[in-house]
């Protein structure tokens, strides 16, 4: 991927971080548990760069629900599926930083067809620190597309 495209990706994630609302507090309504979600205005899909008339560009075709709620100590699971020609690669980000696998964080990829890939991000056990904005970024030489997920914990 060219330096210019990476620059646009970094700009996109910086823009995403600026959109995070710093006001905390409880979520309205009745129900069990408390929400400490510290962001509010996050777009679900972001088209970073693509030629719209080019059907070969990376496109996220399905994924987990935009707003994820997880219980502390249990598994947080996010799924993303992308298509393009050539088959795109998928990278996972949290708050704009690329996620690196570690003891409690794993991601898996599975090619489905010549032009499609499926990826799953697992955080197990999930903690308060795992709350935030996650992004699945699909990339191929013809374009980049991102799908955001808001994850918040409950007791």
Swiss-Prot record:
Expressed in body wall muscle cells, the pharyngeal muscle cell pm6 and in four head neurons. Gene3D superfamilies: Immunoglobulins. It is found in: Synapse; Secreted. Disulfide bonds join 80-136. Disruption phenotype: Disrupted localization of levamisole-sensitive nicotinic acetylcholine receptor subunits in 80% of mutants, and this is mostly in conjunction with the disrupted localization of the associated transmembrane protein lev-10 and secreted protein lev-9. This results in increased sensitivity to the acetylcholine agonist levamisole. One of its GO terms (cellular component) is neuromuscular junction. InterPro entries: Cell_Adh-Cytoskel_Orgn, Ig-like_dom, Ig-like_dom_sf, Ig-like_fold, Ig_sub, Ig_sub2. Coiled coil: none annotated. Residues 1-22 form the signal peptide. Glycans are attached at residues 55, 114. Residues 73-154 form the Ig-like C2-type domain. Keywords: Disulfide bond, Glycoprotein, Immunoglobulin domain, Secreted, Signal, Synapse. SUPFAM superfamilies: Immunoglobulin. PANTHER family: CONTACTIN 5 (PTHR45080), MYOSIN LIGHT CHAIN KINASE, SMOOTH MUSCLE-LIKE (PTHR45080:SF34). Required for the localization of acetylcholine receptors at neuromuscular junctions and for subsequently controlling the response evoked by receptor stimulation. Interacts with the non-alpha subunit of nicotinic acetylcholine receptor unc-29 and lev-10 to stabilize the complex formed between unc-29 and lev-10. This is Immunoglobulin domain-containing protein oig-4. It comes from Caenorhabditis elegans. The gene is oig-4.
């Amino acid at each position: 991927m060219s330096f210019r495209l990476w620059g646009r990706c970094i700009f996109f994630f910086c823009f995403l971080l600026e959109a995070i609302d710093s006001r905390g507090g409880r979520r309205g309504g009745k129900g069990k548990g408390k929400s400490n979600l510290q962001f509010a205005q996050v777009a679900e899909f972001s088209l970073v760069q693509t030629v719209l008339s080019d059907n070969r560009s990376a496109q996220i075709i399905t994924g987990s629900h935009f707003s994820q709620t997880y219980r502390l100590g249990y598994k947080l699971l996010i799924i993303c599926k992308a298509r393009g020609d050539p088959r795109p690669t998928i990278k996972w980000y949290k708050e704009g930083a690329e996620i690196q696998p570690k003891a409690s964080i794993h991601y898996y990829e599975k090619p489905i067809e010549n032009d499609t890939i499926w990826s799953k991000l697992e955080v197990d056990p999930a903690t308060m620190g795992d709350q935030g904005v996650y992004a699945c970024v699909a990339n191929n030489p013809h374009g980049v597309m991102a799908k955001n997920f808001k994850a918040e914990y409950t007791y």
